[in-house]
């Protein structure tokens, strides 16, 4: 029982740390809009009304969907941080590179501190849950079933 409890809390900790709430330098994925794909490609091969179908017919019925897959080449990343014209042209001076390095280090430091704070709080919560479960289990071991 303790093993499953610890396993549950470990998975909770892993998922909560994976979803640390936003920073200013978030990355967003950009994909092709779904409006570019014709609706005819998503139309099932046959149409049957609800009244004329039974559960047997549904198991035999096959639907064919044609989908256009988006390749990884069409997916790009886009920073929400605005870029100057110099950065877009690839002409960066030493001072602008220093500023970008400093801002990246600052946001990494903030992210690290936030992650450590979340880990500490989560550790406290897990310890509380484990002690509560241990109390329940130890209290239940003294009871006798009729």
From Swiss-Prot:
State the residue spans of region: Disordered.
25-112
Gene transcribed to yield this protein: Glycam1
State what protein this is by name. Answer: Glycosylation-dependent cell adhesion molecule 1
Q: Which residues carry this modification: Phosphoserine?
A: 54, 59, 71
Give UniProt keywords alphabetically.
Answer: Cell adhesion, Cell membrane, Glycoprotein, Membrane, Phosphoprotein, Signal
- Tissue-specific expression: Lymph nodes. Associated with the lumenal surface of the high endothelial venules of peripheral lymph nodes.
Please note every region of biased composition (Polar residues): 74-106
Q: Which GO terms describe its cellular component?
A: plasma membrane
Q: Which organism is it from?
A: Rattus norvegicus (Rat)
């Amino acid at each position: 029982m303790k093993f499953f409890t610890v396993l549950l809390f470990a998975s909770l900790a892993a998922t909560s740390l994976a979803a640390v709430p936003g920073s200013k330098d978030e990355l967003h994925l950009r994909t092709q809009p779904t409006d570019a794909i014709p609706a005819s490609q998503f139309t099932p091969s046959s149409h049957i009304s609800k009244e004329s179908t039974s559960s047997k017919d549904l198991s035999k019925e096959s639907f064919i969907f044609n989908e256009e897959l988006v390749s990884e080449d069409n997916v790009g990343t886009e920073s929400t941080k605005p870029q100057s014209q110099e950065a877009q042209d690839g002409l960066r001076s030493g001072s602008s590179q220093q500023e970008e390095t400093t801002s990246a280090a600052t946001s990494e430091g903030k992210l690290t501190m936030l992650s450590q704070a979340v880990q500490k709080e989560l550790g406290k919560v897990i310890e509380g849950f484990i002690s509560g479960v241990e109390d329940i289990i130890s209290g239940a071991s003294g009871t006798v079933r009729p």
